[in-house]
Amino acid sequence: MRCGYCMPREVFGSDFHFLPRAELLSFEEISRFVRVAARLGVSKVRLTGGEPLLRKDVPRLVHMLRAIDGVQDIALTTNGLLLAHHAAALGHAGLDRVTVSLDTLDEDLFRSIADTRAPLARVMDGIAAAHEAGLDPVKVNMVVRRGVNDGSVLEMAEHFRGRPEILRLIEFMDVGESNGWRLEEVVPAREMLASIAERWPLRPLSPQPDQGVASRWAYEDGAGEIGVI
């Protein structure tokens, strides 16, 4: 997989020199950093990437972080392709919850956006495995781009309505020169919400202290909630 947002093939090609493995932080170094941060009041930790599940033995790192005084919540963000294999071990190690990046339910579009030959079913299996492992709530992040996958918003909303997952719609953001950000591809949050509310009425939910940057909306018919970032 070569995610077009953070690792497009045209920028990170075969001649790109990645950081040598010997220079990566060890689990012990990561744990030491988190231990210091926890003493300063940090209580929530998120493992992300790149793809964190490409790192060998990530459940061991989760177990080490779980043992640190002051750490109350450990989350992980993943593309979901390896999640089915690791979910049970991650849950057993003490992971609290997981966020899966998924931008469409269309097989061909999924492979195009993710630049992968892996089937969409592997991501869906990973989401199911996360539930079985008790990694709830499972949040599904969808980055929406006009002319790319904005036509998938209603399909995604319909699929995840009434399910335990929380769909979060994300405006296409400029993260530097690598992701080819263009203003004309940005779909404003209000536009995404309006398209969904036209079919399924929504009501705003009161902010929670730990909800982060997302605004939360509930379906008026009780079929769950969505978030917008």
Regions found by a protein language model. Name each.
Residues 1-25:
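Canonical Radical SAM [4Fe-4S] cluster-binding loop centered on the CxxxCxxC motif
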Residues 2-4, 13, 39-40, 216, ...:
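N-terminal [4Fe-4S]-dependent radical SAM core
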Residues 7-10, 102-104, 171:
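Short, small-residue-rich loop/turn micro-motifs
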Residues 8-11, 95, 114-118, 197, ...:
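A generic structural signal for secondary-structure junctions
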Residues 13-18, 106-114, 176-180:
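A short acidic, helix-capping loop that chelates divalent metal ions and anchors anionic groups
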Residues 24-46, 55-166:
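Radical SAM/AdoMet-radical enzyme domain recognition
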Residues 51:
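Conserved G/P- and acidic residue-centered "switch" motifs that form tight phosphate/ATP-binding loops
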Residues 108, 120-124, 128, 132-227:
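Radical SAM enzyme [4Fe-4S]-AdoMet core and its adjacent flexible, acidic
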